[in-house]
Design a protein with these regions (language model features):
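His/Asp/Glu-rich acidic catalytic environments and adjacent acidic regulatory segments
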Residues: 1-196, 211, 291-294
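Active-site-proximal, well-structured secondary-structure segments within enzyme catalytic domains
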Residues: 41, 45-46, 74-77, 84, ...
Length: 325
């Protein structure tokens, strides 16, 4: 369904952002902005609205706009398919642990979280919280390698191979950028960002790269020294980095976790929003798309309703990585 709906939404968005009549009205207001006496906020809103139309391609000829809309629709379908493949591959991978050797090093909290009553085993998946916890805690090197490769090789073969999709997306983005007068998709994306250009982004990365690489080499040497006769591998990094942190700084993340319970973090975020922006959050009984969804009525300083804030804080197989709200 998602692969059908997203292209439809893209068509509707393009019908607005590429609309010649609507763009002409925005342009007339923008061209006369100096005489309108706009305040700072309205002036900024006008600037961003005009820019959005320009960057969508509204100023181009009907033929070019038609091509841009067609490319946008195709990209929308491909990016959705890419994300679905990744999600399905993430859901499909399961590492079942049944012996003491296989769960060596895992904390009681983590073992409790991954216990599967039906399978009578501890089951590790590829969602980030489960994956990273296992890679940090597990003493079983071969299982860390298996999980690492399971994560790394998602959507790289068979019907869910994202390689051809990524290539097609890149080609379409390059074609769209050329139609709009940009040297590349990267030039288009970075035009109004801090880096301004691909070269600006690369220059910044190189400033970090040299000292970062030197530090990484030192850390790798330290971790290699911790391996008795074995060669350091990528799947060792999380596990040995945590051991190194404990040795050097006596910093155990498990000891700080009680201070970062969901309730505490959420209360802190709401308090900060109230202090900075005068927002208040009141929990309301609204049915969500999942039983774990919690909704809040958001109001301003005067108590005026601003919107509904719905939180979906817990990882599950059907969610994309990072989709917490």
């Amino acid at each position: 369904l998602e692969t059908e709906i997203y292209p439809m939404l893209t068509r509707e968005y393009d019908a607005i952002s590429l609309n010649e009549v609507l763009y002409d009205r925005v342009k007339k207001v923008y061209d006369s902005r100096e005489s309108l006496g706009l305040n700072e906020q309205d002036s900024r809103l006008l600037e961003l609205t005009h820019r959005s139309f320009i960057r969508s391609g509204a100023a181009f000829s009907p033929d070019v706009k038609s091509k841009i809309a067609s490319i946008n629709e195709e990209i929308s379908g491909l990016t959705t398919k890419f994300a679905q493949n990744l999600l399905l591959e993430t859901k499909a991978f399961r590492l079942e642990l049944k012996s003491d050797e296989e769960i060596s090093g895992l904390s009681d909290d983590f073992k409790s979280a991954i216990w599967d009553e039906e399978k009578e085993a501890w089951v590790v998946g590829l969602n980030r919280s489960s994956y990273e916890s296992f890679m940090v805690q597990s003493n079983n090197r071969s299982l860390r390698e298996k999980l690492f490769n399971g994560y790394r090789l998602r959507a790289t073969q068979g019907d869910r191979d994202n390689g051809p999709i990524a290539i097609q997306i890149a080609k379409l983005r390059a074609e769209r950028a050329e139609l709009m007068g940009y040297e590349s998709h990267a030039h288009y994306v970075l035009e109004y960002n801090m880096a301004k250009s691909p070269q600006g982004a690369e220059d910044f990365l190189l400033k970090v790269w040299t000292p970062g690489l030197e530090q990484a080499k030192k850390e790798r040497a330290d971790m290699q020294a911790m391996l008795a006769g074995e060669t350091f591998q990528a799947w060792d990094w999380w596990h040995l980095a945590e051991k190194l942190r404990l040795q050097r700084y006596e910093l155990d993340e498990n000891q700080t976790k009680p201070y970062f319970k969901l309730e505490n973090v959420q209360a802190g975020a709401f308090a900060m929003a109230e202090k900075l922006f005068g927002l208040s959050f009141e929990e309301v009984d609204v049915e969500g798309w999942n039983p774990v969804v919690v909704s809040f009525d958001v109001k301003d300083r005067e108590g005026k309703h601003l919107g509904l804030f719905m939180t979906d804080m817990y990882a599950r197989d059907s969610k994309r990585g990072g989709a917490w709200m």
